[in-house]
Amino acid sequence: MSKTAYVRTKPHLNIGTMGHVDHGKTTLTAAITKVLAERGAGSTTQYVSFDRIDRAPEEAARGITINIAHVEYETDTRHYAHVDMPGHADYVKNMVTGAAQLDGAILVVSALDGIMPQTAEHVLLARQVGVDHIVVALNKADAGDEELTDLVELEVRELLTAHGYGGDAVPVVRVSGLKALEGDPRWTASVEALLDAVDTYVPMPERYLDAPFLLPVENVLTITGRGTVVTGAVERGTVRVGDRVEVLGASVETVVTGLETFGKPMEEAQAGDNVALLLRGVARDTVRRGQVVAAPGSVVPARRFRARVYVLSAREGGRSTPLTTGYRPQFYIRTADVVGDVDLGEEAVARPGDTVTMTVELGRDVPLETGLGFAIREGGRTVGAGTVTAVE
């Protein structure tokens, strides 16, 4: 049976759920798909059950595995690709590696428990990796006391304000993912209200459609008889079947012979789309996660760059001791993981909680440009987050 082609009828956004473990992120994600799937005869959304999201296959990301579930759904005005990361470690790794470039996020907070350590950590991480818009779902509101829920809402707004999200303006919607899954009309309506808030509060991002095509490689697959496929989110520009592209890091120039999103063929992919690209005549072992597929000649790989970096405090899960010149951590840039030497120049020491300027010399060439965000990792934890200010 031939596959149905992907038809772009609505603007596309990438969204994700975040929040403390057991506050109901996965249940709410399942409820969103169920409510939208049952909206009427014209619904294009398919219901995805809790178990299917919760048992999402592991995705290998440079030596670390991430459990991440991808679902898609449509509201009246938009098409969403939604990621749910069931475990806390999965969320941290995902945000740090940029495996999911989110245009906005739904922060799920239990009305019974309020803010927990992971709630605050997820908000901090979202801010660092450039998620500019958050909508709050106060979950389990069916079981909570109204006065207590009011207090939790106040707490959440204060937390968001502290991290630069303008907590007073952020939509906070009281929901019950569980009751919505059970079909309770009141709580089904609450999920619809949440989606309305996402539709109206999270703006359409600038997608850089006019810029040269660039896609950071997240995964590489082989389709028997057809060739090598790379998957990832298009960072900027557009790509069509037949376009010439180069794989930076593999020094290969080739042609895109196939294009799919969520298993549906498409003629053209644009910035923000999650896609699979079939590349002509490229051997499976020449391409790997961390490389970049781009319009030929549009990006020059480099090793040295200057950056502004925030060093996480011990309270945020970072180091308890300062960094000095000569420090050699792992740099997570787009989907690449590269060791690098740090030179702090005149600053000499960077204490946990400081924001500093540093020069970095990477162990190998990586496509770099001003404004690119990255994370610094050491011993399996994030110790810093920064932005490239100059490429040398």
Curated annotation (Swiss-Prot):
The keyword Hydrolase applies. GO terms for cellular component: cytoplasm. It catalyses: GTP + H2O = GDP + phosphate + H(+). Monomer. It comes from the Bacteria. PANTHER family: ELONGATION FACTOR TU, MITOCHONDRIAL, ELONGATION FACTOR TU-RELATED. Belongs to the TRAFAC class translation factor GTPase superfamily. Classic translation factor GTPase family. EF-Tu/EF-1A subfamily. Pfam families: GTP_EFTU (PF00009), GTP_EFTU_D2 (PF03144), GTP_EFTU_D3 (PF03143). It is found in: Cytoplasm. SUPFAM superfamilies: EF-Tu/eEF-1alpha/eIF2-gamma C-terminal domain (SSF50465), P-loop containing nucleoside triphosphate hydrolases (SSF52540), Translation proteins (SSF50447). GTP hydrolase that promotes the GTP-dependent binding of aminoacyl-tRNA to the A-site of ribosomes during protein biosynthesis. This is Elongation factor Tu-3. Keywords: Cytoplasm, Elongation factor, GTP-binding, Hydrolase, Magnesium, Metal-binding, Nucleotide-binding, Protein biosynthesis. It is an enzyme of class 3 (hydrolase). Residues 84-87 are annotated as: G3. InterPro entries: EF-Tu_GTP-bd, EF-Tu_GTPase, EFTu-like_2, EFTU_2, G_TR_CS, P-loop_NTPase, Small_GTP-bd, T_Tr_GTP-bd_dom. Its EC number is 3.6.5.3. The gene is tuf3. GO terms for biological process: translational elongation. The keyword Hydrolase applies. Disulfide bonds: none annotated. Its main location: cytoplasm.
